[in-house]
Amino acid sequence: VFTPTEGCRVCILTDFDDPAEAMTGLSFLEQEGHEAQKNAFRYFHEGLKNGGHEALGTSGGDLFAHVCTHGSNLDLPDELWNAEGRQLSFDKDIYPNYDIILHIGTYSATAPLTAKCKEFGFRGATMHGMNDVILNSGLAVDYEEVSADAERVRVAMTNADTVEIDFALEDGRVLTASLDLGGQEAQKSHGLCQGKAPDVANLPAGEVYFVPRDANGQFPTKYEDGTLGVLDVVDRDVKRSTLIEGNQATIDAHNARLLDDPMTGTLGELGFGTQVLPVSYQDIQDEKVLGTCHLATGRDDHLGGDIVPEMFKKHENSTHDDILFAPHKTPNFNVKEVRMKRGDQEEVIIENFRPSRYIMDALAAGR
């Protein structure tokens, strides 16, 4: 992923609600939970120390922790703590002093680290929610092959003018969301940060994505408490949510948030998985599965988009929130069909959560 690594200084970042307490004497290792944090320590901090540095030609491997942001891709605080419980500064002590920075925590930090890597020149990766399934599948693959597959799908979809998605609900309704992509070059998340250019990968990788220019229609969503709703999209913005089933208070809270800070409803991404992987129950891997698609609202500057944190009324709202459509995650909705239009060409991309013949042929090409 990070070739060349010779001479690179590496550190590992994670997060806790009380990092000073958790890091002092590494007390979190004796506490319940903290699966991602313990994996960061065991497989990366100790893995580098016990042979990894020698194999890669790297040094460092230090573990640091910051206060958990409780939001996807929110800017990180400047304060963080080392294994002795001593407080340090990201801008003074971390970003200028490490060549490769790995973030393995509760929430994604791809957006803030992407902004900082351009300022300080490091390379890195974010691997939030890392569990044993991810370690043994999405992170245990040949990333040259992941990159090649992502490129095959990217070429098959690049310069798309529009994508339409039909969602079939259990009550028989079919909702359609139409996304205007303006013929833009498709991008890929392929996991490789090779060379010396500053970049931050999102791992596990394997997706093709676009930043929508416009969007209209409706699509369903599933809230964290299991409530199901229909979102109305007008001029790229989610305007309102309507209850399908579950808790009306959840819908009301979302509508209040949309009224209070409309940028939280702006669509910032359309993505398609390109890999065959097992379900991990973490969106970071599951959105990379072939046959799934996802939309995201909010911040998208790390994807080359125009939605930056300063545009939100409240800092805590400047998240990048993925809405994944996958059989295990949204069994109440079927992605009946995804269609791409590119000039005079029209292709089906997904049918009933399965990649279309067009996509399978693209993946088979050049092998």
Which sequence ranges carry the predicted segments?
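Active-site bordering "gate/hinge" segments
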Residues: V1-Q218, Y223-G226, R339-R367
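Active-site lining segments that contact anionic ligands and/or coordinate catalytic metals
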Residues: G7, N216, L228, V238, ...
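A short, compositionally biased
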Residues: A156-V163, D237-K239, T330-E337
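A generic structural signal for short, non-catalytic loop/turn and secondary-structure boundary residues
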Residues: T158, G172, P212-D214, M263-G265, ...
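Oxyanion-binding "anion nests"
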Residues: V208-A253
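Dual-mode signal for accessory low-complexity, basic/Gly-rich regions
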Residues: R240-P309
